Amino acid sequence: MAEETRQSKLAAAKRKLKEYWQRNSPGVPAGAKRNRKTNGSIHETATSGGCHSPGDSATGIHGESPTSSATLKDLESPCQELAVVPDSRSVKVSQLKNTIKSLKQQNKQVEHQLEEEKKANNEKQKAERELEVQIQRLNIQKGKLNTDLYHTKRSLRYFEEESKDLAVRLQHSLQRKGELERALSAVTATQKKKAERQFSSRSKARMEWKLEQSMREQALLKAQLTQLKESLKEVQLERDEYAEHLKGERARWQQRMRKMSQEVCSLKKEKKHDKYRVEKLERSLSKLKHQMAEPLPPEPPAVPSEVELQHLRKELERVAGELQAQVEYNQRISLLNEGQKERLREQEERLQEQQERLPEQEERLQQLAEPQNSFKELNNENKSVLQLEQQVKELQEKLGKERLEAASQQKQQLTAQLSLMALPGEGDGGGHLDSEGEEAPRPIPSIPQDLESREAMSGFMDHLEEKADLSELVEKEELGFFQYYRERCHQKVYHPITKPGGSAKDAAPGGGHHQAGPGQGGDEGEAAGAAGDGVAAGGDYKGHSKFLVTAQNPAHEPSPGAPAPQELGAAHKHGDLCEVSLTDSVEPVQGEAREGSPHDNPTAQPIVQDHQEHPGLGSNCCVPFFCWAWLPRRRR
């Protein structure tokens, strides 16, 4: 298209030139006409060459610039000839030059358009090639999709055939099932008749045996209920006694604190008096030294001066002795203060250890309560007994909470008192006891300024005693629960070991038929085992109450709050505060409880022997693994 437009423009330009020369031809001389003819022939050849064969047009794309330059040269030659023409033709010459310039510009525009068209053609060719490549890819994908579709159709046909085969087989199996059900119904009808005949003869004896077994279990449960009620009453009595004992101990300690505060006030007054007296003596001593340093007057009589000197020397020696004694006493008090500080640190460490042990003991109690909850779910027939056990536990938890609240309150008071102990003169709380223990002719020495340290010490001792009582109770409860679960676990271990024909009296304390035969009485054996477990729990509660009675009010031991008289005397002699050895008082009680538990509970004796033979059983507070392995057996 671009070549055609270019050729049409060239043809139009040539026509315009012809018309122009034809117009201006009559006034031109013969030489000019000749030139015009020659130019016309050249133009005709150029036009004929421009409109010639397609081969000439193909060459004209690249060869049009030389033809146009030739035409321009032809046009310039007549212009040079026209320069000779008069001035009337100069205007025409200028017009011709303008037309030449316009033709040159048109030529440049045409060349520029040709280049742009070439670029567009190249881009179109590239786009066509890319489209061809994409078409090829699409054709390849189409072929793959066709193959996939063919394979899927083939697999669908295969699955349809298989489904038809399966439907046919299912119909055959349903028919076979119906035939088998008919045959089985006929067989079961005959077997039911035979079984009913056999069962009618055996059911009477089994029902009688079940009735006897249920009566025995009911009697055992009633006995267990009575034992648990008695143990609950004993626990309540022990709680009341312990509360009264705590009230008495608190009153006694309050009275003791009042006495100590009165003593502290009196010691304050004595300290002030002693300070005043020491200052007075120091003044008199300084005066005496000053008098001795001054020269004696020459005229005084000899006898009174010697008497005065002796008197002054004696008084000086006495004052020096008092000062020396005061210094020694202060040194002793500093040593006692250091010892008291060390004891306070030790007691604080013990208190921290007990506080760290409390969460561990709570975790142990929770671990012991978890298997108890599982036994509740398993033993549905002992719900009433387990409810009573839960009530006892709740009472114990309430007691523990009350004691913990009291301990926390006392701890807050102790922290307040210990913050007061941070004042200067800390730890000098044992001087008055030393002054009371020693009957010396010299005056009462000075007292430390921290007078609240004695009150803090007594409150601290009271708090430690209550902590010791709480730890005793927690350890006793752990012992009771531990022995109870250990007995149950040993009973459950001994249950499958015993022979089918024998009784289970060695394994369970209830005396009932704890185990059943291999083919009869499985549920009855489970109920009897649960009843035996309940009796063991009652026995453990009795033993636990005895442990509490012997631990709280032993006949040969003083109360845990009050120190022994021998210890008080020793404390007065050494000039130290009254300290009660809490750890020593806790350990023998635990030993007595551990020694008395097998004798109180008859079922614990074989268990203790077995535990001594096998120390691995029951060494931890949690339930052993073989008990959990026995539980699915019992569910069956």
From Swiss-Prot:
Q: Which organism is it from?
A: Homo sapiens
The alphabetical list of record keywords is: Coiled coil
UniProt biased composition (Polar residues): 38-50
What name has this protein been given in UniProt? Golgin subfamily A member 8F
- UniProt cross-references to PANTHER family, sorted A to Z: GOLGIN SUBFAMILY A MEMBER 8C-RELATED, GOLGIN SUBFAMILY A MEMBER-RELATED
> Gene name on record?
GOLGA8F
Gene Ontology cellular-component terms for this entry are: cis-Golgi network
Compositional bias (Basic and acidic residues) spans?
109-127, 429-441
Gly residues compositional bias: what residue ranges? 509-522
- The ranges of region (Disordered) come to 1-72, 107-127, 344-364, 422-449, 496-537, 588-612
Q: State one Pfam family annotation.
A: GOLGA2L5
Which residues fall in a coiled-coil region? 93-148, 211-263, 306-412
